[in-house]
Amino acid sequence: MTGDIDREARRVQVEGTPGIDGIDFVEVIGNYPGSEGFVPRAPVQRTLLVHLLNDAVPADLDATRVSIVGGVRTDPTINPVRVVWAYPAIAVAGEAGSPTLPLPAGVDESDTRLVDGALPSSAAVRRRVLVVRTSSSGDWSTYLLRLLGAGGQGVPDGF
């Protein structure tokens, strides 16, 4: 997308409108040693929380349907930032801090604790969050996260 976008006006139009959804905001969980909520063995700045505006995360929204582009460093250990896994927050941390077992592929108990500590306890909020694990923390430049439609094309239905 290019040009000026009145993000707040767009958000107001989409929020609460039946049959249409969108990304409200993306949160990067820092998980720095010594910080409040630090979880040992959970990665630093590689867990993203993608908050949707209206509806629960679609069950078929997974790592193959999340794209991250951006970054300026040419170091292949940093860029491109790849999506390792992506699951609804309730699959990772449960609706009230106790996920259904077994945990999804690639997710461990430290991920559950990290995500649980970063989200409010509200089941309604947790249902609207997609958790994305990245291959690196990237660099300090701008990145764009996109949700893709079936087959990795376009946008998801209803977005």
Residue ranges of model-derived segments:
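Intrinsically disordered, low-complexity, polar/charged repeat-rich segments
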Residues: 1-159
